[in-house]
Amino acid sequence: KEGYAMDHEGCKFSCFIRPSGFCDGYCKTHLKASSGYCAWPACYCYGVPSNIKVWDYATNKC
């Protein structure tokens, strides 16, 4: 699956002030995804395993 990475509060994980390539590494390391990029202003991940939670508009608390 794919989607936005979340922080510890369930909000989209911001990449606004992160260096280039940060989201790819973050998605691979923290979400076990195949890749990711900064879809300004948040990290978007591809190839996320089905058991890993990603941000969902329906359950958004931010």
From Swiss-Prot:
Signal peptide: none
Domain LCN-type CS-alpha/beta: 1-62
Database matches in SUPFAM superfamilies: Scorpion toxin-like
InterPro entries reported for this sequence: LCN-type_CS_alpha_beta_dom, Scorpion_toxin-like, Scorpion_toxin-like_sf, Scorpion_toxinL, Scorpion_toxinL/defensin
Gene Ontology cellular-component annotations: extracellular region
Top-level lineage group: Eukaryota
One Pfam family cited in the UniProt record for this chain: Toxin_3
GO terms for biological process, alphabetical: defense response
Protein's UniProt keywords contain Disulfide bond: yes
Tissue: Expressed by the venom gland.
GO molecular function terms listed in the Swiss-Prot or TrEMBL record: sodium channel inhibitor activity; toxin activity
The family this protein is said to belong to: Belongs to the long (4 C-C) scorpion toxin superfamily. Sodium channel inhibitor family. Beta subfamily.
Name assigned to this protein: Toxin Tb2-II
